[in-house]
Amino acid sequence: MQYHQHQHQFPGPGPSHTSVYSSDGFSCSMESIPLPEHLQQRNPPMEEHYLQQTILPTRVPESTVAKAREIVLSHITSQEHLPWDTFRLLPPKADRHQKDTLYNGFLQVLKMITFVALFVTTLGSSILAKLSLLVMAAGLGQAGHNISICPDKIPESPKNSVLISPKNAAKWAWALLLAICIPELLCFARSLHRSLFRKVRGPSFLQFLLVFTVESVHAFGLGALVFAIMPRGMVITMLQLGNSLCLIPSLLLPLSRSRSRWLPLLLLLDGSAILAQSSAAIWRGSIPLERFGFVFLCTSLISIAWWQNFVHPHSFLPATRFFAHYAAKLRECRSKTFVVLSPWKCLIFTFCMFQFVPPQIPFRELLQKDPFGEKLVTINAYNLNQSQLNAFQERMENLERKAFHQQHPHIVHPLKLNRKIVENIANGEAALFRNGTRRPPKKEEVKKNKMDSKKKTKKLKKKKGGNNNATSTNSSEKTPTKGGVLPTKRERRTMAATGSNERVEADYSSNSDADEQEEEEENVAAYNIYDDRVELNQFTTANDALWLVFVQAGSVLLCQLCAKFACKVVMQRVGLALPVVLSIPFGILFLAYSCRQKATNPCHLSEWMSKELFWQCPTRPFHWQRFFREQPNLLWLCWWLSQCWITIHLWLPRQERLAKSEKLFVLGYIDAPFPEHSIALDRRRDDKIQIRSEDIDTEEEANEGGGEQEDGNSSTHTCESAASGLVVVEAPFPKHPNVGRPTAASICSNGSLSSGSHRSDDGGLIRELPSSADSVCKIYVCATMWHESALEMGCMLKSIFRLDKDQCARRNAQRYLKVVDPDYYVFEAHIYIDDAFELDENGNPHPNKFVHQLLEKMDEAASTKLQLRTPRICVTSYGGRISYVLPWRNRLSIHLKNKLLIRQRKRWSQVMYLYFLLGFRLMLRVHEQKRRELLAENTFILTLDGDVDFQPECVHLLVDLMRKNRRLGAACGRIHPRGSGLMVWYQKFEYAVGHWLQKATEHMIGCVLCSPGCFSLFRSSALIDDNVARKYATKSEKPFHYVQYDQGEDRWLCTLLLQRGYRVEYCAASDALTFAPEGFSEFFNQRRRWIPSTMANVIDLLRDYRNVVRVNDSVSIWYIAYQLVMLFSSVLGPGTIFLMIVGAISISFNIDTRLALLIVTTPVLCFCVCCLTCGTETQLLLAQVIGALFAMLMTAVIVGTSLQIQKDGLLSPHSIFLFTVLGSWSFSALLHPLEFGCLLPCGLYFLAIPCMYMLLPVYSLCNLNTVSWGTRENASVSSSSTGQFSGKREERGDILPHLQKTEDGELSVGCGNFCRVVCCVRNPSSPPCADETVEVRKLDENFRKIERKLQSLERRTNGQGNNAEEEGKEEEETGKSEQERKEGREEGKEEEGKMSKRKKEEMDLKGWMELEPFRRFEPIVLDTEEESFWREMIEKYLRPILPNSNEQARIQRGLNELRNTCCSAFFMVNIVFIIVVLVLQLQKDCLHIEWPLGPLVNQTRVQCGGGGGRDFEGEEWIMSRLQLEPMGFVFIVFFLIILFIQFLAMLFHRFGTFTHIIASTELCCAQRPLDKLSEEELVAQNAVEIVRELQAIRGIDSSLSRSEQFQQQPLQRQTRQHFPRTLSLGKRQQNAQIPPRCEKGGNERGEESPTSLPAPPVINWSEVHRNHQRVQPMEGGQQFDPRKDTLDAAFRQRFFALSSSSIAADHHQNNGGHLVDTTGTGHIGAAALPLTLNRRTLRALEQRRNILYQRGDRKRIPALNQQFHSIFPSSSESEGEEGEGGGRGRGREQERDKCLEGKKEKFRQRVEEGPARCHRLEELFGKSRKGGPQKRGKVNGENMKFLGTTNKRAK
């Protein structure tokens, strides 16, 4: 038995309480005491590791023991809860971006609509695609047949028929070819794009040969089925063949099964599926006899394409495993393979068409010149009497007259009628689909039609036009009556142009070539009348078959898109699986109904289809009773059932949200004849790694736990998925040497990414994994702080605690309930505080007030009901570190940076954690290359600022984006500024518009250029890549580097990622709040940093655009052009605003433009001069004054703009631009309903335009030589310290502090570059004058000499040594020449460095640990490896830079030159632009562009001279157009184009955000009622929610109403009942503190059952409720039980103490004898009882707990813990009896005092006898573990006997 020391902190000030526990959880002492040596050295792994452990040192000083004993006794006597302190102080309501109930309800409705729309669209598009292709196949099969059509063309006869010639039917062969080739052509285009613009692998010869063979066979089978089978079969039969395409998958399915106890049953079902699919060989159907066996061959060849999806790497057959691994390699080179195979498959389809179609259609007809052009068709009507013939002739003549009068309205009595009537016979144009019924022709009728056709052709050649009436009864001998001659194509086009609205609707042509066809078209009559029949010749609509192809291809693509969308948003069951099952049955229903209607109504569907086009229906009428009795239909039913079984994986999806298509589908292409079935078979069967709960262990679990189980059983459990909601059958995993040993979930660098040239991009495919736990998401939360306020610190800490709570719920769900959560992650938090130390009067560092402020906020941020455990503290090479264990057992490390030891600033803090977390923990500790790659891809760094506020759901959304795309290097969320004041209001609108338009545009058309450091998620594999982290650690050398590297470090890091080929995305659904600058000066200083760094990074990106476009798939040359345009608009923005103000003043006040120019120029010129000559405070003061004046002037601009609109009209360019901008903002706000309030400060934004877009850029560029931070510049060092030790300030970590007089600060809002036409700017401080530089340098040199002398004197006085040689050198240095003085200055710097090093060595770097409150923390020492890492890291990258006057002067000169160059170019460009526009405006009459829209019409009266000397007034109408200067017109069009691009990109981005939100929304109504779920399903579906309720603390986690408090009270009161903590997997207990009690109490039920775990202590819920009603008013002032050091331990107590029977009895008594049915609520909601009060839930939890933890000797652990608990029972059991009255209260206080005295005495006794007792326990339990099964009973008896004796002694 081993012992471990844990720290527990009681509420209130004072040191911590130290307890020593044995490995089995028994408390042996209550204070720190020297333990036996054999107990101090051993520390085997533990299973429970929620608290960090510290192995006791070999020697514990007596002073430490006495101090600990005194502290513990003082805590025992202290009163934790004062009964009179019942009043509560509630924290203020959080200023958060709330999503209320209405919003959640709206999401529920929206998801329901999406479900319905997806189902209907997928099902409808799949049915339409199949039916449209089948109708094309039916049209091909009609060649040479005479079919019946709708009698609307010749209504005089009840039956109309038409003969379909082969030439007319040839177009359907080409239509079928196009239909099946379009998906292949799209696949070719996609593969070609990936091959050209992405780095993809090419196939080897064997790989290409295998894929080539398979795809060729598949293409031949598909082509043969379409061209040889479908045109000759009945439509229902052809539709049924879609379910017989699974033969090869059915054969591979049983070969891919893994070993499990369900394997026999699965093999039986697989065999049935094989028999069903093989029955296609004997299926007869309606296929012609010669094609009998050909159907089975075609379906078999088609099904071979999906073999890759049905071979599994975990198969029990080695051959199947080999092919599975080979298939994974094939998928990596799929793009380059299909660049060749897609065109090849189109050639195979063409070969099949020419091979199987010519028996029906000759080659000559297939190769005709225009197969899709207009064709002639003859409509016949037989068996007509004379009256019917006369009626037909009269109708035709009337149509001719009508057509003639429409063309020649001026001719009243035509001498000869024009016979061009062919397109005027039918009413309406020919539609895409027209009616037509097929009727098999008789042989006699075919002969007669041929003879009539020959005679008719001869007659037509003899005579054109005229009406010859035939009276003979023999139609074969007499000349028929003919209608007018059909017009030529030219004439028909002319008639169409004249507006004729009557078109021909049938299709016919003779068997002749193109020349004969032209001649025939000119000679064929429109109609012919015979003795008993008539003929009507008409032209069809051109390209009608092409339109049908487009409909079919569009349906296929729509089906594919909907299916992919359903899989991405986790709606696969409804959006894909259900349509796959129902598509063919619904299609059969529709066809059966249509065929039945067609048999009775020939005009059925005539409005939607061509007259002659219809499916080939069965000859016999369709009846459902006969349908299911026929053998082919029964076989089809077997096919359908077998396909449902083969595609059962569609109903069990395991993919993550928003997964890429490469992760969802194997091949990616689709077959046009059966789109949904090809998608179903192509959908991946294993799209996510199977992760076991035993493998999901954190890194500390792996270090503490391990080893085999005690009973030697290595079998594990397959766990339920919390996402799917279905219980997976438990199956043992194969025995493996690593089974049972948790794997360290650390991360590693990607070694394969070292060069970047040989990196293989598999499109997001998951490779072979060394361990399934390596794919678990791990998040490092890294926050940088400087001088944040207490409120800002509290917001950031509360966000971390929320993340801690969420992670703990998911961890406990998979740890205790054995449910694997797909969103599970591991996280660890780090906070880096810059300049955390200040010097005291002795020159020793100690933490400043901000560190103390942060420590005070820790307990406050945790909650008001609990305090954190005692943290650990240590001294490091960079200062110090404080390590906390959060309430839900995750770790938080606070790194205190000493600027004398390490460089300060945010960028260097980021370099610290990049190298520590990714370099040290990954590269140094993980050696396997594949594991490094996998861990690096699944490890992320969440960067935070010290004032950010966010929810865990926002982090999940960013992780979803990371999982979707492996090439995604960073993702950022939507930043919301918070605070108060006008500046915050302005920033809210600015942030909103910037995110809505600018960031969304960057995301859609390229990459986001800046992922703000206040809330962003970075991928580790991207950060550790070449030229990223290493280049990020580069020290600034050039002036441009100081602007790019240090002023905008977040943007620069994203630039490095883009240049390396990674993508940066923006997630609008992930919200984070941050404090924005509230003052004018702070805002200007912040933007003074942002604008130059933004421009510098954009310029750097544009310089390297060739490399970025080449390596980055997301950046194109068009995106580079967009950024170039935006850069130009930013530079010319101030000039544009200047001109706008000048024009507005001129119009508003009706003054000359020159005077308005002078008015505006004067203040702007004064401000520019001030920025170049005066100090920062003067500049900011003048900026406020001028900005206020311009804001007041902007009110006149509003009037001027209104007048301009009234003058120029609503269609003027200025009006259009203004309304477009306002409309885009308003519509964007409507699409962001939760952010609509951000649109309200629009007026303030308008008033601030001159200040923010004209003055701010000038201020930023004029102060470009100032590189201070500018925000939160509070003095952090006391005046005494700075006065005495001013020289130490020179030893900071950067050279930048010497370039200005202000302290560095930290970025509060890390979001840059917002959407506006003009970019914002930043604020620098004033540069020193050139004349002052030399004087300052001389003074600095003299001060340094004096300082060195003082330091030498100080060392001599303190007895720390004296160096006379140094003084001699200093004296000699003053007398040297100028050259010698320079050399001496360098030597002085070296000597100063040595002195500085000695100073650091002489400092007491550990003394601060003895100060308050650090002396109460637990001191530890870093391990040697980490200490060595920090020393080497600081020495190489982070060593403080010593001051160098020459270097400082050089950099300052460079910054001044950079400032002068940029300002000169900036002012020159804007001045030239202003002059050009103003001159063009003044000379607008000479050089202008007339605006075509909105001409102005003016009416004037003029005096006109009349006859006789009299004048009169006349009206003159003058139309004028706006005259625009060319430059202004170009800029308006330019900005409109940018706005249109941004608006369009915003729409697409909103759709992506909608997809993300829908995928993350859980539909409440989709969950089955609780009473309908089994107990296992209840736990599996709601595991995380159950854990949240069990680990919740009332009053902390949610604000409950009184009814909800009553409902949750039994659960909350249960936490006060003590129960042994280690009841899990039989390993030792870590954190079970069992304090003593003075009197006997508690429940003695603990008997061990032979079949289950011992019953936990039963809690009297009715008594608890009564006590709760008495003490409820006092609970507001009580603190949480300090014995529960983490809420994770509280959850464990509640989990093992749950009892469904006690809760049932409690509810029975509380409801007047009526038992409440808590399961009848149906769904989980706010008004429903918590899940943990549901008796079925508790019963399921009990059953699962007993099953999971009843293994071997584990079942005896609870009994031992309960027996030993009687020795030291919890004193909290009596707390519920307090508060009944004052007298009883005073009596209890006396009893409590006696009890505490007894506790002290017992504690002293236990301190003395603790080691012996613990040693005895270890011996007994050691024998129990070593003994066999026969000896354990005896040993257990001895243990019980010993425990009973110990219990008596304790009593």
From Swiss-Prot:
One of its GO terms (biological process) is chitin biosynthetic process. Its main location: membrane. It comes from the Eukaryota. The chain crosses the membrane at residues 109-129, 169-189, 209-229, 235-255, 262-282, 292-312, 338-358, 545-565, 574-594, 632-652, 1125-1145, 1155-1175, 1180-1200, 1210-1230, 1236-1256, 1462-1482, 1528-1548. Residues 130-168, 230-234, 283-291, 359-544, 595-631, 1146-1154, 1201-1209, 1257-1461, 1549-1851 are extracellular. Belongs to the chitin synthase family. Class IV subfamily. SUPFAM superfamilies: Nucleotide-diphospho-sugar transferases. Residues 466-478 have a biased composition (Low complexity). Disruption phenotype: RNAi-mediated knockdown causes a delay in egg hatching. It is found in: Cell membrane. The lineage of its organism: Eukaryota, Metazoa, Ecdysozoa, Nematoda, Chromadorea. The keyword Flavoprotein does not apply. This is Chitin synthase. Residues 455-465, 1823-1834 have a biased composition (Basic residues). It comes from Meloidogyne artiellia (British root-knot nematode). Residues 442-454, 1374-1402, 1637-1648, 1781-1822 have a biased composition (Basic and acidic residues). Required for the synthesis of chitin.
